[in-house]
Amino acid sequence: MSLLFLTICLITMNTLVIFDFTKEADLKNWDVINDTVMGGVSAGKMGKDAAGNGLFEGHVSLDNNGGFTSVRYDAGKIKLQGYSKFIVVLKGDGKAYQFRVKTNKSESYSYVYSFETTGNWQTIEIPFSSIVPSFRGRSLNMANFPGDYMEELGFLIGNKKEEHFKMAIDNITVQ
């Protein structure tokens, strides 16, 4: 066997797919949460583009003290032992977003990692050790994401300005 083949096998064996967007992928466990829960008027939606990629898009408004929209995926309990980072393949719009993950979906806080998009397809690598606990934009005095398991993940845009946004997502894995 060639060294290249063995390397590919080893890399693939240590990758767990959390969600792979395809034309057939069901979005029933993806929910949009807008700032309307707090009186705002921002509007985001989750769908698919023509290629089958996940498409999180909409408009963030600052009216009525709003300013964010988010999408969450209820993944069920997934063990993450043996992995050290999330990998997200996406195409953004040049804006800043947050990747958010919860160990227990009923917890009020999330673990958050902020990233910038380029407007091109890119691979975002998110080390578990860099995902920080946060509640409503405030850092918490707790350890960073432990990486034992997760139940929910998602994305949030809230850059303290009114803006349209659009982010396509190909897949989310852990390695």
Where are these regions (language model features)?
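Beta-rich carbohydrate-recognition modules and glycan-binding surfaces
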Residues: 12-175
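Bacterial Sec-dependent N-terminal signal peptides
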Residues: 1-17
